[in-house]
Curated annotation (Swiss-Prot):
Keywords noted in UniProt: Ribonucleoprotein, Ribosomal protein, RNA-binding, rRNA-binding
Span of domain KH type-2: 38-106
Region of interest (Disordered), residue spans: 209-288
Species the sequence originates in: Salinispora tropica (strain ATCC BAA-916 / DSM 44818 / JCM 13857 / NBRC 105044 / CNB-440)
Family statement: Belongs to the universal ribosomal protein uS3 family.
Listed name of the protein: Small ribosomal subunit protein uS3
CDD domains named in the record: KH-II_30S_S3 (cd02412)
Biased composition (Basic and acidic residues): 219-232
Keyword Cell membrane: no
Ranges of Polar residues composition bias in the record: 277-288
GO molecular function ontology, one term from the record: rRNA binding
PANTHER family documented for this protein: 30S/40S RIBOSOMAL PROTEIN S3, SMALL RIBOSOMAL SUBUNIT PROTEIN US3C
PROSITE patterns hit by this protein: KH_TYPE_2, RIBOSOMAL_S3
Length: 288
């Protein structure tokens, strides 16, 4: 399911947070419609601003809108004229007082939405899709925060008659791991052959507080192994006594046979005694 489901919704409450924070009972439908219109207005009116995401928070008589952008100067405008214009539109749309916050994205090369938007702009400019994908991946992996990236494009790539999907990946992108902090971005490139969808996944390590990752977890202390002479010797159950007995019996039999060989020819030796001595196991005493 990690390959199918939206990475942001899949990890809500675990490693990601809601982009709209408010509570409503009867006005739930109206608020959802307003949020969609606000984000659509930002995406269509400020294409060159490089907007990563828009967070919306509502209270009883105020709406707070946080715009995360890579180019805050375009959103603010000259002497704040553009910001005032956007605030006026939002107040007219919501009918409430709007608090507009413009937040700059420090590293746009490692932001999934901005990377997808950059690849889509290059595809619209007729740049080779492979070159655009590899360039975006190389610039993203230069950031030490980025642990892995995957870029996927789908559509009539290179003006082909049949649409297809291609992707490139570098590093680790664990889509099934819930504690993984994965950013996801999607953007559509408009070309003369049709639209090409661009999807970007960026893995930035684990983001669950109070939980140690395998790399950060302290290693378990290893028990020092003593010298072999210091360790107690463990005998095999039922085998040590038998082995010792068999050895002593063999020695006794060899001694008896040697004595028989040294006996003078006139004296007779009991063959049965020799055989019984050879076969009878010697008694072994075990020290307590």
């Amino acid at each position: 399911m990690g390959q199918k489901v939206h990475p942001h919704g899949f990890r809500l409450g675990i490693s990601t947070d809601w982009k709209s924070r408010w509570f409503a009972d009867k006005l739930y439908k109206d608020y959802v419609g307003e949020d969609v219109k606000i984000r659509r207005m930002m995406s269509k009116g400020l294409e060159r601003a490089g907007i990563s995401k828009v967070d919306i928070e509502r209270t009883r008589d105020r709406v707070r809108v946080d715009i995360h952008t890579a180019r805050p100067g375009i959103v603010i405008g000259r002497k704040g004229a553009e910001a005032d214009r956007i605030r006026g539109k939002l107040e007219k749309l919501t009918g409430k007082q709007v608090q507009l916050n413009i937040i700059e994205v420090k590293s746009p090369e490692s932001d999934a939405q901005l990377v997808a938007q950059g690849v889509a702009e290059q595809l619209s400019s007729r740049v080779s899709f492979r070159r655009a994908m590899r360039k975006a991946m190389q610039s993203a992996m230069k950031n030490p925060v980025c642990k892995g990236i995957r870029v996927q494009v789908s559509g009539r790539l290179g003006g082909a008659e049949m649409s297809r999907t291609e992707f490139y990946r570098e590093g680790r992108v664990p889509l099934h791991t819930l504690r993984a902090n994965i950013e996801y971005g999607f953007f559509e490139a408009r070309t003369t052959f049709g639209r090409i969808g661009v999807k970007v996944w960026i893995y930035k390590g684990d983001a669950v507080p109070g939980r140690e990752t395998p790399a950060e977890a302290p290693s378990r202390p290893r028990r020092e192994r003593g010298d072999r002479s210091e360790r107690p010797r463990r005998g095999r159950s039922g085998s040590s006594g038998t082995t010792a007995g068999g050895t002593e019996a063999g020695r006794a039999a060899a001694t008896t046979i040697a004595q028989a060989a040294e006996t003078p020819s006139g004296e007779s030796v009991d063959a049965g005694a020799v055989a019984s001595a050879a076969t009878q196991p010697a008694e072994t005493q075990q020290e307590g």
